[in-house]
Amino acid sequence: MTESLDGIKERALREIASARDTETLQSVSVKYLGRKGAVTLFLRNLSQLPAEERPRAGQAANQVKQDLQAALDRATEQIAADSAAVDGIDVSLPGRPVSRGTLHPITRITRRICEIFGRMGFDVVEGPEIETDYYNFEALNIPKHHPARDMQDTFYISDNVVLRTHTSPTQPRVMEKTAPPLRIIAPGKVYRCDSDVTHTPMFHQVEGLMVDRNVSFGDLKGILTLFIHRMFDPETSLRFRPSYFPFTEPSAEVDIRCVACRGKGCRICSHTGWLEILGAGMVHPAVFEKAGYDTQAYTGFAFGMGVERIAMLKYNIDDTRKFFENDTRFLRQF
């Protein structure tokens, strides 16, 4: 009878494990533990055993009964938990869309600048952000004791190493390794000791350089005019003003008609109707000489612009610091 009891337990546990609802479990309980169940009948038949075997068989039967009841209780709880989890899902509720990131406005503008000049034959190059004094200043005709070298304008790492103050150092680096003709633009981060509504200690620039035979200021004006019309609007008015940069001669500032007031005068343009957008000029012969270029055979022009400045005008943003605050309410607009 003991072997028969083991068989009863094995069959009952299999049926409990395969049950998928409480009704099935109730049937299993009646089948094995009910008044006419297999375990109950086994206990009733103990009188047929020899007297010396009855205690051991009775103890085994009661243990099987307890084991089966415990298995039934666990299965009932699991089925109830599974049912509650399913019932807790309201399939009629609208789904939650996955939140997707977008390109930062500075990245958008930088890529757009590279795209426009890329269509005009300019290659994109990059340079180190930690730069030597020579490439950041000397190679660009910025001599010792020039105001741009002052501590209030430049982050010095050591006496001869700085965080680059512009992306212009890329130009002499490329010219030393590349014979003309060449057309390059150099986007990247730059650093200056400055922080206010329109300036941050770290910002982004794009420098451009074109060198070839017979390159003129007229070529510079034509390329920059085309760039501005493609970046903003074909009807955008612009003007070139005389200026000074150590690495270009002659030099110019380029202004566009104020995008906010359309030239009528407002707070953004200081009531002049114009907004400065970039600086440019013909490459100074001293820069060519340091790079090993023949100043009698080649001429060229260079230009530089602040990406934040372009983005502020493009998107009508009044504070450059918004680009660096990581406010998703602001960034989600782009």
Swiss-Prot record:
Binds 2 magnesium ions per tetramer. GO terms for cellular component: cytoplasm. One of its GO terms (molecular function) is tRNA binding. It is an enzyme of class 6 (ligase). It comes from the Bacteria. One of its GO terms (biological process) is phenylalanyl-tRNA aminoacylation. PROSITE patterns: AA_TRNA_LIGASE_II (PS50862). Keywords: Aminoacyl-tRNA synthetase, ATP-binding, Cytoplasm, Ligase, Magnesium, Metal-binding, Nucleotide-binding, Protein biosynthesis. It catalyses: tRNA(Phe) + L-phenylalanine + ATP = L-phenylalanyl-tRNA(Phe) + AMP + diphosphate + H(+). The keyword Metal-binding applies. Pfam families: Phe_tRNA-synt_N, tRNA-synt_2d. Mg(2+) binds at residue 249. CDD domains: PheRS_alpha_core. Signal peptide: none annotated. InterPro entries: aa-tRNA-synth_II, aa-tRNA-synth_II/BPL/LPL, Phe-tRNA-synth_IIc_asu, Phe-tRNA_ligase_II_N, Phe_tRNA_ligase_alpha1_bac, Phenylalanyl-tRNA_Synthase, tRNA-bd_arm. Its cofactor is Mg(2+). Its EC number is 6.1.1.20. It is found in: Cytoplasm. Tetramer of two alpha and two beta subunits. Belongs to the class-II aminoacyl-tRNA synthetase family. Phe-tRNA synthetase alpha subunit type 1 subfamily. This is Phenylalanine--tRNA ligase alpha subunit. It comes from Desulfosudis oleivorans (strain DSM 6200 / JCM 39069 / Hxd3) (Desulfococcus oleovorans). The gene is pheS.
